[in-house]
Swiss-Prot record:
It comes from Toxoplasma gondii. PROSITE patterns: PROTEIN_KINASE_DOM. ATP binds at R241, D244, R245, S246, K263, M337, P338, A340, D343, D393. Mg(2+) 1 binds at D393. Mg(2+) 2 binds at D407. Keywords: ATP-binding, Cytoplasmic vesicle, Disulfide bond, Glycoprotein, Metal-binding, Nucleotide-binding, Secreted, Signal, Virulence. Belongs to the protein kinase superfamily. Ser/Thr protein kinase family. Disulfide bonds join C458-C492. The gene is ROP5. This is Polymorphic pseudokinase ROP5. Gene3D superfamilies: Phosphorylase Kinase, domain 1, Transferase(Phosphotransferase) domain 1. InterPro entries: Kinase-like_dom_Apicomplexa, Kinase-like_dom_sf, Prot_kinase_dom, Rhoptry_Rop2-like.
Length: 549
């Protein structure tokens, strides 16, 4: 504690000395005897002094009268008047030291006295303070902690944010781009269904075990709401996809005649009862963080919040369902949410199988996906939230064409520290690979946004990172492993320059210089992207693909 107080006192003394030095001025009135002595001509008025010195300016530095003595060669050599000695003697030691320091800053090789006679008007106090502050910052720059060195930049960014009008990245109902995506994907519904079936072949044993546990003899299952919404009778329609710890099914509420996606969790070391209870709290805490209902969050923020959490009737919630199988134990905790048509990961796998986004319509679809991804991330930033899984397998295109972000349990309040392992390793920037914990900032979502947009145009990840499910992807497991850091677009669908610029700024390895989603919406590149989409949709003529040089 004493050390900290001593450091604080030292800083205060240094700053006080600099401020006193910068503000040191003559306190006597202009026509006083003190000024007469300073000019070297006692009892002479200011005007007479100017006449003798040959100057007529109103400088705050009175010009000294210089005597001349004969040189051996016949010339004249200027000499400082004798009265200056008297003046120096009459001043205090510290005052003379300050004056000499002030004179010596702009001189070199002993030219201080000669240069002072030619000084112009004294700079204003504000400029002198700024100059001294720059000197102080340069002197103590290496001793300043990193968090303090960036304080000015953060304050400047905060002030700019207060000065400019706040952007509203929220969505307003169904937009023209959504209808275009709906019609485009509807034409490829059969192909997407085929690719979904292929993706479910490998985990078929897990899907069958979970299905038999939740729907014995393929009968309807009665579930009770954990949110006081009553009971439901759910009938299985088909499996949709498999995650690391869950299986998602398409089900029908036989009484309300509504279709939902039902997320069923498997139990294990990572899905213990306490972990599922924490997951339940985190999932429905997202609505409280947003201050919006699940319906409003889906409509305005495009966040896919669950409609309900349910448990199989007559069995304890969060416990293991019985009868079940030891290899694939199922938790009695199920999430109901609106069903999506396709997630971006499955869409990329489909495009890798048969690239259907060809021609002008395909290019327009890529433009729309790019703009919607940026707005999705900007919505999170506007609410002060960070999503740890802003990844293609967690981004869904709904039946009406809207792009939504799922798994709201991965939402963090900005500035919160959490486990770095909660971020998928191939989508983690370097600041999340150097320690066991990391601070969740908007820079994380900016990085993941850049990777997702890159995959929209290129299907695979950049920097040689491995991309499961994509033919010909690279093998680098993460940025922790040495490899290329250059951003290449040679194997991608031809990109417009403004999209390349946005991707490059999102994928800046320096997180302090990384372009954030809200800032991206103010860039000329994003405005050009929006204009391309609007003009193509309004005229009915899709935007042309960029030419390849």
């Amino acid at each position: 504690m004493a050390t900290k107080l001593a450091r604080l006192a030292t800083w205060l003394v240094l700053v006080g000395c600099l401020l006193w030095r910068a503000g040191a001025v003559q306190l006597s009135p202009p026509n006083s005897r003190t000024n007469d002595l300073a000019s070297g001509t006692p009892h002479v008025a200011r005007g007479d002094t100017e006449a003798q010195s040959g100057t007529g300016d109103d400088s705050d530095f009175p010009q000294a009268v210089v005597e001349e003595v004969a040189d051996m060669s016949g010339g004249r050599v200027p000499r400082v008047p004798a009265s200056s000695t008297t003046t120096s003697a009459s001043e205090g030691i510290f005052r003379r030291l300050v004056r000499r320091l002030r004179r010596g800053r702009g001189t070199a090789d002993g030219a201080g006295v000669a240069d002072e006679t030619h000084q112009g008007p004294r700079p204003p106090l504000r400029k002198r303070l700024a100059q001294h502050f720059r000197r102080l910052r340069g002197f103590f720059g290496r001793l300043t902690p990193r968090w303090l060195s960036g304080l000015g930049r953060r304050a400047q960014r905060w002030w700019r944010g207060r000065q400019r009008p706040l952007l509203d990245p929220s969505f307003h109902g169904l937009e023209a781009g959504d209808s275009f995506m709906r019609d485009l994907l509807k034409r490829e519904e059969e192909l997407i269904g085929y690719c979904r079936e292929e993706a479910l072949k490998e985990p078929a044993a897990m899907v069958e075990a979970v299905t038999a546990t939740v729907w014995p003899q393929n009968a309807e299952t009665t579930v009770d709401s954990l949110l006081s919404q009553g009971e439901r009778k759910l009938k299985l329609v088909e499996p949709l996809r498999v995650g690391d710890r869950s299986v998602v099914f398409l089900v029908r509420d036989v009484e309300r005649l509504e279709d939902f996606a039902l997320k069923v969790f498997t139990m294990g070391a990572e899905n213990s009862r306490s972990e599922l209870e924490r997951l339940h709290e985190a999932t429905f805490a997202a609505a409280r963080l947003l201050g919006e209902s699940p319906e409003e969050a889906r409509d305005r923020r495009r966040l896919l919040l669950p409609s309900d959490a349910v448990a199989v009737q007559s069995q304890p919630p969060f416990a293991q369902l019985s009868p079940g199988q030891d290899d694939y134990a199922v938790a009695n905790y199920l999430l109901l949410m609106p069903a999506a048509s396709v997630d971006l990961e499955l869409l990329f796998s489909t495009l890798d199988f048969v690239y259907v986004f060809r021609g002008d319509e395909g290019i327009l679809a890529l433009h729309i996906l790019t703009a919607q991804l940026i707005r999705l991330a900007a919505n999170l930033q506007s609410k002060g939230l960070v999503h740890g899984h802003f990844t293609p397998d967690n981004l869904f295109i709904m039946p009406d064409g809207r792009l939504m972000l799922g798994d709201v349990s991965a939402l963090w309040k900005v500035g919160t520290r959490g486990p770095a392992s909660s971020v998928p390793v191939t989508y983690a920037p370097r600041e999340f690979l150097n320690a066991s914990t990391a601070t969740f900032t908007h820079a994380l979502n900016a990085w993941q946004l850049g990777l997702s947009i890159y995959r929209v145009w290129c299907l695979f990840l950049p920097f040689g990172l491995v991309t499961p499910g994509i033919k010909g992807s690279w093998k680098r497991p993460s940025l922790r492993v040495p490899g290329t850091d250059s951003l290449a677009f040679g194997s991608c669908t031809p990109l417009p320059d403004f999209v390349k610029t946005l991707i490059g700024r999102f994928l800046n390895f320096d997180r302090r210089r990384r372009l954030l989603p809200l800032e991206a919406m103010e860039t000329p590149e994003f405005l050009q992207l929006q204009n391309e989409i609007s003009s193509s949709l309004s005229t009915g003529q899709p935007t042309a693909a960029p030419s390849v040089a």
